[in-house]
Amino acid sequence: MADIDDLNATFQQVVAAINRRDAAAYSNFWHEQIVAFPPTSPFAVEGKATLRPMAEANFAQTESVNFSPINPQCRVIGDTGIVWGHTALTRKPKDGPQTTMFVRFTFIFAKTDGQWREVAVHGSQLPTVG
């Protein structure tokens, strides 16, 4: 259970960094070779060196971000940690109205040198009921 507890604690720290709009703190959890599929991008973003400036720019353009995981699940398989679930992602841009989108997410972590590092993240917007 210690690995799952450590993984969950790491994920909670990731969520807190996102909600503070703190790209430096968030990127401290990333592996150098992270691959990200943000919910609003059709393309993958590869590597910490590429993703960090994008996160900084995104956070700089927002007054507030609220990433609220809904019943996240954690699983550990060897040195791989998986966190998945749904979230309400609320953003208030500096130049526009607040919006909320509902997203399903998967965070993949690898245990490297005793620490969980985010190696992949995927978020996809849930379809709206029409």
Region locations from a protein language model:
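Basic/polar N-terminal segments that are highly enriched at the extreme N-terminus
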Residues: M1-D5, V129-G130
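A solvent-exposed, acidic/Ser-Thr-rich amphipathic alpha-helical stretch
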Residues: I4-T10, A16, A23-G78, H86, ...
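Residue-level signal for short segments within beta-strands and strand-turn junctions
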Residues: P38, R91, A110-K111
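Hydrophobic alpha-helical segments of small multi-pass membrane proteins
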Residues: P72, L89, R104-I108
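Generic short beta-strand segments
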Residues: G85-K92
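Short beta-strand edge/turn micro-motifs at domain boundaries
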Residues: F102-V129
